[in-house]
Amino acid sequence: MKDHECETYQTMQHPQRPYGLLGKTLKHSFSPQLHAAIGAALGTSYPYILFEKQPEELASFLRGDSWAGLNVTIPYKEAVIPYCDALSDEASEIGAVNTIVRDGERLIGHNTDYAGFRALLRENGVAVRGANCLVLGSGGASKTVQCVLRDLGAAKVTVVSRSGDVNYTNASQQQDAEILVNTTPIGMYPNNGQAPLYPGSFTRLQWAVDVIYNPLRTNLLCQANKAGMETVGGLGMLIGQGIAAAELFLGRAIPQTIGAKIEKDMLLEKENIVLIGMPGVGKTTVGMEIAERMGREFYDIDQMTVYDDGREIPQIFAEEGEAYFRQLEQKIVLSLANVTGAVIACGGGVVTREENYYALAENGRLIFLNRDLTMLPTDGRPISQAVPLARLYRMRLPLYRSWCDAELTITGMQPDEAARHIIDML
């Protein structure tokens, strides 16, 4: 069931006031799906919808009675505080509210982001005690992150803002930073592909954490991954704060163990399966098999490039050259950057442009299909014909391995067997 269908269904089945997410732009949100999953895990359900409001609508909405409880996101985590009759200890200390519940006629502001972010760090093994931390952004989410880091014993917490003493023009001077946390919306769907700064400029950086969960891995995290750092996306934080909020909404304790299963299920549903490897290795055939077995959309970048240009690949190479083809290919790759839950088969040379990596990795699990070179066909494959296959393989192997999240050798496998292996890896 799609998110919007889930919302409509829940509202129809529950005539009582809904819970929901309050924000300005909510196209990126997974929250309705998350709360549906929490309800299902508890053997119940509760209506949860999105409330997109402009700043001038905030007062009348919060003073109205059209909702039972709220989660609050950018840019209203601080703006809602004057409308709350009381704040929890965490919300009061942090100065930001992400959950509002009703107590009779009173509105009580809470901060469940604190629990969510703390759980995210714990579950991913991010050792904060004694570490120098750099926090990007100075809004409500930043205040929560700063509080958690200090409570966990960080040696230093430095905030980077647009106009502060430490800003984006001089942040790279913070060379003692060991943990970087992005709390800005830069890189969030639909503006994928952006990053507030380059993490590779910090020589001591060990961890890059982003509270953004859509895309699953922001451009910032992809850059950090390429630079050899450990990375953590924001999906686990979303789920942790959502469970804490649901406890407040429903007035009952919820086992934290359900979070791991919800995260695994959401990741499996949202993450693309991206196949890379040599020309002729079987990416299209195996990809189609995976898509059929999992009921997913299938995208073949070579086929899409041919359709877009109107000429077959050998003709494009012969008439325009490889550089022209790579530009066409990159255009198709970038058009798929916001796609989720699909299977994508890439051309063999997609790894020759680093920009393609970031577009594919933000929402994708990249799997390198490897096969004995003697079994690779070369007909209709211009590069395989122009360059000796063994040489081409030696040139590209380091790229395939630096890009991939997993490698599977499929020599001797039938497509259905290879597809089963890949599905089992997820």
Residue ranges and their predicted role:
Residues 13-124, 215-217, 221, 227-230, ...:
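Phosphate/diphosphate ligand-binding glycine-rich loop within oxidoreductases
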Residues 23, 111-114, 121-122, 126, ...:
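Glycine-rich adenosine-cofactor-binding loop
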Residues 166-232, 350-356:
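Rossmann-like adenosine-cofactor binding region
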Residues 212-271:
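Adenosine-phosphate binding glycine-rich loop
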Residues 260-269, 289, 293, 381, ...:
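NTP-dependent small-molecule kinase module
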Residues 283:
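Conserved lysine of the Walker
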Residues 303-361:
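ATP-dependent small-molecule kinase phosphotransfer cores
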Residues 362-399, 406:
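A glycine- and Lys/Arg-enriched "phosphate-lid" helix/loop adjacent to the NTP-binding pocket
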